[in-house]
A protein has these predicted regions:
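N-terminal extracellular ligand-recognition/capping segment immediately after the signal peptide
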Residues: 52, 63-84, 90-103
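Well-ordered beta-strand segments characteristic of repetitive beta-sheet solenoids
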Residues: 66-68, 83-89, 106-108, 116-118, ...
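N-terminal secretory signal peptides that target proteins for export/translocation
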Residues: 1-9
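Extracellular beta-strand/beta-solenoid scaffold signature
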Residues: 98-109, 124-135, 147-169, 184-206, ...
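Acidic Gly/Asp/Thr-rich repetitive segments characteristic of extracellular carbohydrate-active
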Residues: 33-67
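Bacterial N-terminal signal peptides
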Residues: 12-24
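Solvent-exposed loop/turn tips at the surfaces of repeat/solenoid architectures
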Residues: 71, 83, 88, 101, ...
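Sec/Tat signal peptide C-region and signal peptidase I cleavage site
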Residues: 26-30
Length: 300
């Protein structure tokens, strides 16, 4: 029998889970918060006019669910705890514009196990991607019909990875449910004084024994990587890999469910002087996997 904790104790325990002991799992909702621009904020009833007002209130704890009644472009602060998001009407997608976050992602997750609901939500215009991890042993499952639109990483210091999602570390796992959509996300890197590289316009995974699983009807369109190491003075190499998905490391596994669609994804590189481009490499317009014993499985 699954033990049931009192609400107060349960919320206290969830709030303390930023320090992992064995694993972190946030699949259960602790409380619901509503974002509704048509209403005045009423914190006592968990109602907020904007998403930024809710995040700034520090009322959210790990496992809470944010219910969106409308599009929102208010965020200037990234999330410090992993919470769920869903549209109040599953038939009406709600778009969250992340441009106000600047060079910060929405989620920056540490080691642990996460299950996040993102149902009928569009994440758009993030300038540092949407989700980033940099630890070993991170497991992230995203449920619901989620879209990633026009997100990017723009790095003028040699390299850029994962326009929407970037996971760096061994034994990292990413799973997305049915109908996940990635459109017009990109990774761009430039340098006039050294080599540059960009990898994974939509998704980048770096590390050994990493796994990406996309369930049925995944769509990748118009995602790209672009590297530019053009210089007035000399030739510097420029590389660009995986317009949609990039995986680097031994024993990497990519599994795509039925009816996955890739269209208009590409890679592009420029290098050398403005009159020559002899050391530019672009590979994997849709998918690029690099490492020993890599495995790609395609559905019907």
């Amino acid at each position: 029998m699954k033990p049931i904790l009192p609400l107060l104790l349960r919320r206290s325990l969830l709030a303390s889970l930023l320090v992992p002991i064995i694993s972190l799992s946030f699949s259960a909702s602790a409380a619901d918060f509503m974002v509704d621009a048509s209403q005045y904020s009423d914190p006592n009833n968990n109602i907020y006019s904007t998403l930024e007002e809710l995040v700034s209130s520090v009322a959210l704890v790990a496992g809470d669910t944010v219910i969106l009644n409308n599009d929102d472009a208010s965020l200037t602060t990234g999330l410090t705890v992993p919470v769920n998001f869903r549209s109040a009407d599953p038939a009406a997608l709600c778009a969250v514009d992340l441009s106000g976050l600047g060079k910060n992602p929405l989620y920056n997750l540490g080691a642990g196990e996460y299950t996040l609901e993102m149902d009928s939500v569009i994440w758009s215009n993030g300038a540092a991607g949407v989700i980033r991890t940099a630890d070993d042993n991170v497991s992230l499952e995203i449920t619901g019909e989620v879209q990633f639109l026009n997100n990017h990483v723009d790095n003028s210091n040699n390299s850029a990875y994962g326009g929407a999602i970037d996971m760096e570390g061994d034994h990292a796992t990413l799973t997305l449910g049915n109908n996940a959509t990635f459109s017009r996300n990109y990774a761009f890197s430039s340098s006039n004084y050294s080599s540059s590289s960009s990898s994974g316009g939509a998704i980048a995974m770096s590390g050994d024994y990493t796994t990406v699983t996309l369930e049925d009807n995944a769509t990748f369109s118009g995602n790209y990587t672009f590297s530019d190491s053009t210089s007035h003075l000399s030739n510097y190499p420029s590389t660009s890999f995986g317009g949609a998905i990039y995986m680097e490391g031994d024993h990497a596994t990519l599994t795509l469910g039925s009816n996955a669609t890739f269209s208009g994804n590409y890679t592009f590189s420029k290098s050398g002087t403005y009159s020559t481009a002899t050391t530019a490499t672009s590979s994997g317009g849709a998918i690029y996997m690099r490492g020993d014993h890599a495995m790609l499985t395609l559905g019907d």
